[in-house]
Amino acid sequence: DLHGSAYYCRQLLDCFALEGAERLILLGDLLYHGPRNDLPRDYAPKEVISLLNKMKDRLFCVRGNCDTEVDQMVLDFPIMADYAVFPVEDRLMYVTHGHVFNLDNLPPIQPGDLLLHGHTHVPSWRPFGQQNVYLNPGSVSIPKEGSLRGYMTLEGTLFRWCDLAGTEYHRAALEDLTPWP
């Protein structure tokens, strides 16, 4: 959830480059801060548009509750899907913002599938259902409940949560079903 912060968008893109990642998955709420959030640092949606459009071929995004058709008109990559599905080893990961599909209203997951969403701005990892796992990277711009500004990476079956200095503060492999926090 960037929420229009050019400052944190730049920091996230720096982390993306530092990690040497192939793709950046954004979980919605790209340009607007919404009526329930204070303005994030360096609120500059036009600059965020420019920064993201420059790397459109490496982005994958889903729609957040603050994203609209107007946002899609200025962005050069699709953002309006409610969810997407990615393979993670022998499982499927449902990627969504969290306002439509979440633990209380699941997408069409099967036993063993993963649910990744933002929206709450609180990092999390926990098992549910039949060998399913819920993941949340937290937020780079407006973290909540005392959490750090940060991002999450995936390599193989290992998920890492890092702060914006690139320092890992949590990791979990799909084989590990220990809840956190």
Regions found by a protein language model. Name each.
Residues 5, 33, 89, 128, ...:
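Surface-exposed loop/turn and secondary-structure junction residues enriched for glycine/proline
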Residues 13-17, 76, 164, 171-173, ...:
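Catalytic phosphate/metal-binding cores of nucleic-acid and nucleotide-processing enzymes, i.e., regions
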Residues 24-26, 94, 115:
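Hydrophobic positions in the central parallel beta-sheet of the AAA+
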Residues 92, 99-164, 170:
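Conserved beta-sheet core of the metallophosphoesterase superfamily
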